[in-house]
């Protein structure tokens, strides 16, 4: 049986790892063992952060909606409660976009939410 030499495959594997690790600092872009280790970590971080990105954007949208809602004298919590009571089904991504780009439309939604809110039981009688 013929002897199998792995030189070509090994070089191809090493070259692909080193090409993928271009841009890393120091030894991590030049030495195969360091590059392989860094590549493993990099792919792990990328996988983790693709999932974390969804929560990060949701936090950003909520912060933007809250800021715009407070400009209209209502908190984020009461605003969302009012929208649900009114049956308005606009997601947070679109609400945040409205808050940034179209303040008048957002103010209209705030008015709808305020109208749909139940009267506060603990509010002082006027």
Curated annotation (Swiss-Prot):
It comes from the Bacteria. Keywords: Ribonucleoprotein, Ribosomal protein, RNA-binding, rRNA-binding. GO terms for cellular component: ribonucleoprotein complex; ribosome. Pfam families: Ribosomal_L20. GO terms for molecular function: rRNA binding; structural constituent of ribosome. CDD domains: Ribosomal_L20 (cd07026). PROSITE patterns: RIBOSOMAL_L20 (PS00937). The keyword Cell membrane does not apply. One of its GO terms (biological process) is translation. HAMAP family: Ribosomal_bL20. Belongs to the bacterial ribosomal protein bL20 family. Binds directly to 23S ribosomal RNA and is necessary for the in vitro assembly process of the 50S ribosomal subunit. It is not involved in the protein synthesizing functions of that subunit. This is Large ribosomal subunit protein bL20. It comes from Nocardia farcinica (strain IFM 10152). The gene is rplT.
């Amino acid at each position: 049986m013929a002897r199998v030499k792995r030189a070509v495959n090994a070089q191809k594997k090493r070259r692909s790892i080193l090409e993928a690790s271009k841009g890393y600092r120091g030894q991590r872009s030049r030495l195969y063992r360091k590059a392989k280790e860094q590549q493993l970590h990099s792919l792990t971080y990328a996988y983790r952060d693709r999932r974390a990105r969804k929560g990060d954007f949701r936090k950003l949208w909520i912060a933007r909606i809250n800021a715009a809602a407070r400009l209209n004298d209502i908190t984020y919590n009461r605003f969302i409660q009012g929208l649900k009571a009114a049956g308005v089904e606009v997601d947070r991504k679109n609400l945040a976009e409205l808050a940034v780009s179209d303040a008048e439309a957002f103010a209209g939604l705030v008015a709808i939410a305020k109208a749909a809110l139940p009267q506060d039981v603990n509010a002082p009688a006027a």
